[in-house]
């Protein structure tokens, strides 16, 4: 197998340049290539040289397109690729053969954990989004700019701001602002901090969000520096049940920090929660992830220097419908040291590589982070995180599916592995839940994401 070369997109001319001086709006000619030689979000339409990565042909655009026309939100999504078998399996014994298409994190997991393996399946570029998001992206691409600090995006709403990123900040903002829904979404999920021996206590969460940036009535003038308002309600275990978290996530957090409030059922009061950001430990996570690791990365980019390294072909979790299946129990999935590889699906895809290096005058438990972003969706698929001695510490994966009733590509499970302790945390589990996710929760309104509503919820 040939050593993988950095793949350079003709629209991203300064791949290694991280300075803000390299940012520029897309030209009319560049925008005209969206949907022609490039996907509507800026990925390469063509497949790769040997055909292992197919051309993008629109992805799965509906439940009918997936082969399940009667499917509705709130259920477990049937697998469009059921019956496929792995092309091959990567193990510690044969990993050298595939080294050019493995991340540092996956190499480490294969070396450290003798039972970890990667079943590699045929690649399907299933990512798809509503046409209105594609149209909004064409508009945003002509006007969007990073602000003076790079900590926010100006002159863009509803669409992806930078389909042809010129630097690392633009790429990471694409992830932060990529489409998840334009209606209120609610889901029931589980979070499992796993001990080294495989024991865990499941934390059940009701998670809801209103995507301000993507709503149909949002304009540049009324977006009010907001990306999303979201609320977590802990349902179990009993010692945590009733804990509520409300977050108003801002576009430019250096100008206006993220606003967060928490309701503690023991104290029966709402208080501000300024620590719900950056490297503070996430709620009920046993310290295994930081707040800015949810959705693989969230919040302000201000503590890092960002560098766009280029594009690579690597094996990433993709089309993880088996992991999402209601035929599995949580104990089928969660094993000592890592998720059961039997239920994981990896495919070869092109990704953007972004390096984040901690600024000298700031602090974070991760000195360096390497992000791998799917070219078809801008979802972060994998992250390698290094400690302050520059040693690989934690490895994160987003196991994604196309929620084809929308459609939207998003994680069904995030797995964050601590290689130094042998522990990990899985977030997003819903196999044993009767209700999974509803992308148009009409029984909720934006007023349900206010401090007053948080107080009311706490008293119920």
What are these regions (language model features)?
Residues 14, 24-25:
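N-terminal charge/polar-biased segments
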Residues 188-236, 292-371, 381, 387:
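Extended beta-strand-rich segments in extracellular/periplasmic secretory proteins, especially
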Residues 28-258, 264:
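Solvent-exposed N-terminal domain segments of exported/luminal and surface proteins
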Residues 25-59, 103, 231-299, 336-442:
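Gly/Pro-enriched, hydrophobic low-complexity segments
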Residues 9-17:
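Hydrophobic helical h-region of N-terminal Sec-dependent signal peptides
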Residues 1-9:
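Bacterial N-terminal signal peptides that target proteins for export
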Residues 19-22:
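N-terminal signal peptide c-region/cleavage motif recognized by signal peptidases
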Residues 432-460:
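Long, C-terminal catalytic modules of enzymes
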